[in-house]
């Protein structure tokens, strides 16, 4: 298993590229920000280092890789806040339980989200938006609606591209953890 964010991002790109040749339809990673945050924490990565890794992931999944020169149809879900069912679990990095929990990685989650959204807003070298991955953000009772930097970026991306999708867990019978069982 990957022990560093840069390696993990490369492995995810390769996985999506391979799987899109094996299965029809979108391939997805759930709780993207929650699961990547411990890698940021363990290596004490700076924001520019995190952004470089996330950029590599986004550019990688937008690289045509199969007959018909199509990029892998890919989705990611982002939790924005640590889900209750993961909060108290020991974080995993490189297949090893860390001495901290997922709930201890909120700062790193925010870095992953900021890097992802900024890269999506910036677009490619010609300023065009990225087709993939299609992001879905979980809106829960814990969503902080205040005027934060990440909220401004999230809604700027929404206004600019009409993406992401939002999963409304406030007025739903579903739980945020259900996304990992779909």
Task: Please identify what each model-predicted range represents.
Residues 1-182:
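Conserved catalytic cores of very large enzyme subunits
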């Amino acid at each position: 298993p990957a022990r560093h964010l840069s390696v993990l991002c490369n492995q995810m790109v390769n996985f999506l590229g391979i799987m899109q040749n094996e299965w029809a339809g979108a391939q997805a990673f759930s709780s993207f920000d929650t699961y990547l945050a411990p890698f940021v924490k363990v290596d004490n990565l700076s924001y520019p280092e995190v952004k470089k890794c996330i950029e590599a992931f986004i550019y990688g999944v937008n690289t045509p890789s199969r007959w018909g020169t199509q990029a892998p149809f890919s989705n990611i879900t982002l939790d924005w806040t640590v889900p209750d069912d993961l909060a108290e679990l020991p974080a995993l990095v490189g297949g090893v339980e860390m001495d901290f929990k997922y709930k201890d990685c909120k700062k790193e989650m925010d870095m992953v989200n900021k890097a992802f959204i900024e890269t999506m807003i910036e677009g490619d070298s010609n300023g065009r938006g990225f087709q993939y991955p299609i992001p879905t953000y979980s809106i829960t009772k814990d969503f902080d609606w205040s005027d934060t930097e990440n909220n401004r970026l999230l809604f700027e991306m929404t206004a600019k591209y009409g993406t992401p999708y939002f999963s409304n867990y406030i007025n739903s019978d579903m739980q945020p953890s259900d996304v990992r069982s779909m």
